[in-house]
Design a protein with these regions (language model features):
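Catalytic His-Asp segment of secreted/periplasmic serine-dependent ester chemistry enzymes
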Residues: 180-268
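Active-site segments of SGNH/GDSL-like serine hydrolases
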Residues: 138-142, 161-192
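Soluble non-cytosolic domains of exported or imported proteins
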Residues: 61, 65, 81-86, 146-153, ...
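N-terminal secretory targeting modules
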Residues: 1-70, 74-81, 93, 245-268
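Generic structural signal for well-ordered alpha-helices
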Residues: 123, 155-160, 191
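Hydrophobic alpha-helical membrane segments, chiefly transmembrane helices and signal peptide h-regions
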Residues: 13-29, 97, 127, 134, ...
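Residue-level recognition of beta-strand->loop/alpha-helix junctions
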Residues: 103, 175, 207-209
Length: 268
C-alpha cells in the first residue's frame, strides 16, 4: 500500500464531502423548507390594493323583478315632495318590477338612525318571508363621524346577515353619494372600504362618487341645499333613479332606458 496515495485519496474525499455540505447549506438557506408560506389572510390583508377580488357574475333578473332597496334617508325619500317620489320608489317603473323600500333616516352600518337602529339590527328585523330577486344596499354617509374603527367588521356582519336571510337574491352595493362638494375625506374612505369589501365577495359595487353622479355642474339641480338639508330634491331623486337603473342595466348588459320617456333630467 502506498501511504502517499492513500493520504491524497482521503484529502480528495474530504474536499468532496465539504463541497456537498456547503452546497446543501446554500440551498436550504434560500429555500427554507421549514418556514411556512404566506397565508391567504395575510396576503388579502396586506393592503386594499393587494386584496384578492372575485369577478362578479352578470346581473340576471326576471322580466318583472322584485327589488328590496335598503338604505338611509336617501332611500327613505327625504327632501322629495313626497317620500314615495324618492329614487327607491321610482326605480320600480324603470326596472318594470316592484320595489320594497326600507329606508331609515340617519342610519348607517355603525350609526343608529332617527326612526330605527343601525343596518345590522334592521337586517335582523327584516321579514324572512320576502322573496326579492335583487337587493340593493345603499349608503351610507351617516357613518362619516363614526370613524374607521370597527367599520369593516360592521359592514361584513351586515352583509353576511343579508345574504344568509335571502340566499337566492342577488345583491348589489350602492355606495354613498356626496351630499356636498368637494367629496369629503370620510365619504371617500367609506366608498373605498365598501368597494374593496364588495370586490372580495364578487358582488357588484356602484360608486356614485367614482362615477361622478353629482358634479359641480348639476349639484344644485340634484341636491336641495335649503329645506332639504342637502338631500336630493324631487328632481334629484328622479335623476338618481335613472342613473341607478342605467347602472343596473349595464351590469347585466341590457339596453339602458330613461325614465318617463320625454321627461328631462338634471344636467350632468
Amino acid at each position: 500500500m502506498n501511504p502517499v496515495f492513500d493520504r491524497r485519496r482521503l484529502l480528495l474525499a474530504g474536499l468532496a464531502v465539504g463541497t456537498v455540505l456547503v452546497l446543501a447549506a446554500v440551498v436550504l438557506g434560500v429555500w427554507k423548507p421549514w418556514s411556512p408560506g404566506p397565508s391567504s389572510a395575510a396576503v388579502a390583508g396586506a393592503g386594499h390594493d393587494d386584496a384578492v377580488t372575485i369577478a362578479p357574475a352578470p346581473l340576471t333578473l326576471p322580466e318583472h323583478p322584485t327589488v328590496l332597496v335598503f338604505g338611509d334617508s336617501w332611500t327613505y325619500g327625504s327632501a322629495a315632495s313626497e317620500p314615495t317620489l324618492g329614487y327607491a320608489y321610482l326605480l320600480a317603473d324603470l326596472v318594470h318590477g316592484t320595489t320594497i323600500v326600507n329606508g331609515v333616516r340617519g342610519s348607517g352600518y355603525l350609526k343608529p338612525g332617527i326612526d330605527g337602529p343601525a343596518f345590522g339590527e334592521r337586517i335582523a328585523a327584516l321579514d324572512p318571508a320576502l322573496t326579492p330577486d335583487l337587493i340593493i344596499i345603499q349608503g351610507s354617509i351617516n357613518d362619516r363621524a363614526q370613524g374607521a374603527a370597527g367599520y369593516r367588521e360592521a359592514v361584513t356582519a351586515a352583509w353576511d346577515a343579508m345574504a344568509a336571510k335571502y340566499p337566492e337574491a342577488q345583491i348589489v352595493i350602492l355606495g354613498p353619494a356626496p351630499h356636498e362638494l368637494p367629496v369629503g375625506a370620510a365619504t371617500a374612505r367609506i366608498d373605498r372600504d365598501l368597494a374593496a369589501l364588495a370586490a372580495a365577495r364578487g358582488w357588484w359595487y356602484i360608486s356614485p362618487v367614482a362615477d361622478g353622479w353629482i358634479t359641480p355642474q348639476n349639484y344644485r339641480d340634484v341636491i336641495d341645499v335649503d329645506l332639504g338639508r342637502k338631500h336630493p330634491s324631487t328632481a334629484g331623486h328622479r335623476y338618481l333613479a335613472e342613473r341607478l337603473a342605467a347602472a343596473l342595466a349595464d351590469l347585466g348588459g341590457a339596453p339602458v332606458t330613461v325614465a318617463g320617456g320625454s321627461e328631462t333630467t338634471p344636467e350632468q
